[in-house]
């Protein structure tokens, strides 16, 4: 019995030795905890990210454009303090930016005694920049009294009289349910309507012929955004007969800017907002896994395609999107990402679907902010470099057989709608 007892004890101690054996420490990221704000620090950060995660693809030169405060969006925001008090404060595009004269003048004007009721109604004032020193203004306020309404009209007269050269329009907007509106992060289910004001709701984009709605999403700093389309053209080298699709398009500036370099250009976004995009065909649809098979179905969609993806806030693409895009075999896929952790996972997902990362172009769209943004160019792995033995087909997208394509004409826009979405 004593021998059996010792055997059992030894057996138990053997199991305990395995159970208590220390596991090797998990890999700890050596990247700095915070992203630097200067361009040299960002360049070093993205190189360290690529080395640490063994990211393939060539890192090209950083895309930067000098930024002036008058070419950026600004905001005067009403903030709540203790005991129900509120204060109006100026918010800029990046830390240390000096407000342009228009913003300072408006901030000073609304603090005058004869506009007290109007000032008390303000939730925020957006200064949407054109990129060439001019602005469109959107005032979100709640006019509860006739006196506040009269003072708002007085404010409009002030803008037309004193700032006719740099203010193209000013509109009051009302948001239901009541909440602070942000063009970059519109609340789902919110309803926005224009009320009183003057001028067009669409303002120019720099010196181009293109325009955007003052409620639409754009980067805060317009100068880098305006020059981005040229950098994308240099990155992908479009050939004659190629076609282009911009997803999460907003005002579709990229697609319109590149329309002369492609045979056809399309843009898609889920937001139903009035837009002026005469050079392209605009689709209102959610960018999900159902969108791409539906879009590429039909004879009119044959050819070599470049798909440009710019998901908001650095978010990952919706589930199933990458396999569906890859199944349509576009010639190029360009992903604009502002989240390197998400980008690492997206690169792996594209690899699994047979698309290899060819180029990395860091872009500086938010100067002075602790953010890193990059364009990632993916191309089909036709040479089998990813270790897959099968032949990579689909150099040219072809119409799927045995499917009804419907009648499509260039004169009619194509609308994709989903139940329950506006």
Q: What kind of region is each of these model predictions?
A:
Residues 250-251:
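Conserved glycine-rich SAM-binding loop
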Residues 255, 318, 343-344:
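Short, well-ordered alpha-helical microsegments
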């Amino acid at each position: 019995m004593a021998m059996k007892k010792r055997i059992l004890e030894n057996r138990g101690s053997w199991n305990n030795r395995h159970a208590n054996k220390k596991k090797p420490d998990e890999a700890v990221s050596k990247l700095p905890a915070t992203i630097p704000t200067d361009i040299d620090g960002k360049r070093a950060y993205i190189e360290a990210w690529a080395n640490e995660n063994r990211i393939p693809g060539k890192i090209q030169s950083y895309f930067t454009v000098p930024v002036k405060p008058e070419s950026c969006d600004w905001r005067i925001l009403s903030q709540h303090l203790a005991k129900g008090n509120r204060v109006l404060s100026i918010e800029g595009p990046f830390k240390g930016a000096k407000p342009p004269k228009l913003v300072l003048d408006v901030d000073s004007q609304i603090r005058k005694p004869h506009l007290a009721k109007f000032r008390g109604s303000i939730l925020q004032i957006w200064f949407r920049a054109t990129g060439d020193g001019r602005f469109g203004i959107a005032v979100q306020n709640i006019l509860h009294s006739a006196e506040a309404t009269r003072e708002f009209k007085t404010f409009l007269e002030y803008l037309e009289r004193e700032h006719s050269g740099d203010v193209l329009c000013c509109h009051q907007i009302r948001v239901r349910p009541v909440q602070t509106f942000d063009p970059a992060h519109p609340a789902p289910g919110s309803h926005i309507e224009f009320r009183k004001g003057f001028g067009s709701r669409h303002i120019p984009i720099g010196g181009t012929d293109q325009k955007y709605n003052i409620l639409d999403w754009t980067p805060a700093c317009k100068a880098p955004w305006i020059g981005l389309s040229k950098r994308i053209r240099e990155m992908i080298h479009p050939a004659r007969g190629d076609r282009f699709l911009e997803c999460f398009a907003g005002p579709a500036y990229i697609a319109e800017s590149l329309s002369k370099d492609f045979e056809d250009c399309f843009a898609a976004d889920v937001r139903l907002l009035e837009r002026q995009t005469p050079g392209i065909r605009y689709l209102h649809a959610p960018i999900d896994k159902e969108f791409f098979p539906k879009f590429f179905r039909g004879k009119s969609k044959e050819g070599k395609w470049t798909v440009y993806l710019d998901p908001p806030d650095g978010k990952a693409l919706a589930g199933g999107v990458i396999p569906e895009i890859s199944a349509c075999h576009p010639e190029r896929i360009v992903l604009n990402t502002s989240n390197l952790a998400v980008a690492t996972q997206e690169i792996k997902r594209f690899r699994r679907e047979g698309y290899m990362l060819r180029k990395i172009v860091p872009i500086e769209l938010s100067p002075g902010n602790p953010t890193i943004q990059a364009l990632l160019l993916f191309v089909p792995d036709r040479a089998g470099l990813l270790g897959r033995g099968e032949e990579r087909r689909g150099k040219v997208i072809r119409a799927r057989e045995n499917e009804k394509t419907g009648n499509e004409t260039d004169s009619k826009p194509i609308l994709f709608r989903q139940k329950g979405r506006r």
